[in-house]
């Protein structure tokens, strides 16, 4: 089953075509990676899928009428209250999503996010990796069916990135669907079931990582990235 189907999405900003003729599907249960250079329309595409901005042309259809209640989205802005602790943030976001969390449930979530030792520390004082994990935690506190993460490992060291990857894989094991964007091709190759590659506002390649590398006769996604973004002189 498809959770989201987008057809012919177009978006301009100040006469610049940011997204052009974009078609995509998000399939239930998959980990889908959206990749491509900076400025090719990935974040704009995500915003259109979420209904944050409206496309100039095209349509987006959803698997249920109340889809907004069943999506958790962590974008590139800080989604939590910086002056409150991780524990307090989980309780606050639970209330926003009308989910009443017991102390036991909050303790369990903090353990899952590896934040048990810092659960009472103000979020602003957490490390970047801890803040990223908390950001995912508060945006998924209502156990959404679809989770959208915009560059969740950006700026993180390998250990912190590894923790985020484990969280994403755990979501998939718990029957969640995940769409994430990334510039780390090793990361994408490691955890993504399917990849959508964007360039110049369009999808230029899509499929399973192993199928794409085989089709384009390259050893890995990093080499495919270089091939598809090569500038012809």
Functional labels for PLM-detected ranges:
Residues 188-190:
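A short, surface-exposed alpha-helical micro-motif characterized by mixed small hydrophobic
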Residues 122-126:
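Conserved ABC ATPase signature
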Residues 58-69:
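Conserved ABC transporter NBD signature motif
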Residues 206-207:
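ABC ATPase "signature
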Residues 91, 95, 101-118:
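Conserved ABC ATPase "signature" region
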Residues 147-151:
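Catalytic Walker B motif of ABC-type/P-loop ATPase nucleotide-binding domains
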């Amino acid at each position: 089953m498809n959770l989201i189907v987008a057809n012919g999405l177009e978006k301009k900003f100040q006469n610049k075509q940011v997204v052009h003729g974009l078609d995509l599907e998000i399939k239930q249960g998959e980990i889908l990676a959206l990749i491509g250079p900076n400025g090719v329309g990935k974040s704009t595409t995500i915003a259109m899928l979420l209904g944050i901005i409206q496309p100039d042309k095209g349509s987006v259809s959803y698997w249920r009428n109340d889809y907004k209640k069943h999506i958790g989205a962590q974008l590139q802005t800080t989604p939590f209250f910086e002056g409150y602790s991780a524990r307090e943030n989980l309780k606050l976001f639970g209330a926003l999503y009308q989910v009443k969390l017991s102390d036991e449930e909050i303790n369990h979530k903090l353990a899952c996010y590896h934040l048990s030792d810092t659960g009472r520390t103000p979020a602003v004082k957490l490390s970047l990796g801890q803040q990223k994990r908390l950001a995912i935690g508060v945006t998924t506190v209502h156990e959404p069916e679809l989770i959208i993460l915009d560059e969740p490992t950006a700026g993180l060291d390998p250990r912190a990135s590894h923790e985020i990857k484990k969280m994403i894989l755990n979501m998939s094991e718990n029957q969640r669907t995940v769409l994430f964007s990334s510039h780390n091709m090793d990361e994408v190759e490691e955890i993504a079931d399917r990849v959508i590659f964007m360039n110049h506002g369009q999808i230029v390649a899509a499929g399973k990582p192993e199928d794409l590398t085989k089709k384009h006769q390259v050893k890995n996604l990093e080499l495919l990235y270089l091939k598809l973004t090569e500038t012809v002189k």
